[in-house]
Design a protein with these regions (language model features):
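Solvent-exposed, low-complexity, repeat-rich "mucin-like" stalks and linkers
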Residues: 37-69, 152, 165
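Edge beta-strands of extracellular beta-sandwich domains
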Residues: 103-109, 229-230
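Serine/threonine-rich, repeat-prone extracellular segments and beta-strand-based repeat modules
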Residues: 69-102, 111-112
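Bacterial Sec-dependent N-terminal signal peptides
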Residues: 2-47, 116
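Ser/Thr/Gly/Pro-rich, low-complexity flexible regions
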Residues: 115-233
Length: 233
């Protein structure tokens, strides 16, 4: 037998040994993949909860699971609610899973005034901007639309505290509106609660009033700019 033939036979024998060796190993169907389960938090009564002004706020509850395991006891709740003051309060529920990954959800608690019966919801047009900064002379917002939406008696959202300055007049689009919330009192007064815009400006003040005879809304807004606007349907 030649050396070449011996080499070929040896290679076949080695291959057979390797095959037998692999076939004799137990395969349990598992691999090195690992799945982590984030904590899933479910809010009872949903992510928006109404509380009447002057009543007592009690958290409506929540449950949490990590995979199939109940981990409700691991949830941390943060955020205060003043049931004596109209406003929109954020309550956050958070938890960390066994691998150190965090998850959270937020509930908006709306403290409303049941004594407020007037609803000023609607889409209004800007009819004047008297007393405003000169930027509103260079970029007129007259004729732009502003939508007020009642969330609960005495609580409203506003589509744009800047009356469409960037969103419409300058033409950047709705993403550049200054949205927000305000409280509406039974005396027809308006008080700003919060605002949000792409530049994260802080609300200095928002005051105003509604005239039930004319149906007009007047707002004095100071959020980066000073805008005094009258709105009419």
């Amino acid at each position: 037998m030649t050396f070449k033939m011996k080499k070929i036979i040896s290679l076949f024998a080695l291959a057979a040994f390797v095959l037998v060796g692999f076939s004799s190993c137990d395969y349990d169907g598992k691999d090195d993949a690992y799945v982590t389960h984030y904590v899933s938090i479910d809010l009872k009564e949903g992510d928006t909860y109404l509380v009447a002004k002057g009543s007592t706020y009690t958290d409506p509850g929540y449950t949490a699971t990590e995979g199939t395991e109940d981990v409700t006891s691991k949830v941390t709740v943060s955020g205060d609610v003043d049931a004596n003051k109209m406003g929109i309060y954020n309550v956050t529920y958070s938890a960390v899973n066994k691998d150190g990954f965090s998850a959270s959800v937020t509930r908006k608690v709306l403290v409303y005034d049941p004594e407020v019966t007037t609803n000023i919801s609607g889409t209004y047009k800007v009819t004047s901007t008297d007393g405003s900064q000169s930027v509103f002379d260079r970029y007129s917002v007259i004729g732009n639309s502003v939508t007020l939406t009642q969330l609960a008696p005495g609580l409203y959202s506003i589509s744009d505290y800047w009356a469409g300055l960037y969103a419409v007049t300058i033409g950047y689009g709705a993403a550049y509106a200054c949205t927000g919330y305000f409280a509406f009192g039974k005396d027809n007064s308006i008080t700003g609660i919060s605002s949000s815009d792409p530049w994260n400006n802080k609300m200095t003040s928002v005051t105003g009033s509604y005239d039930p005879e004319t149906g007009k809304v007047k707002m004095d807004v100071i959020i980066s700019y000073h805008l005094v606007m009258e709105l009419a349907k």
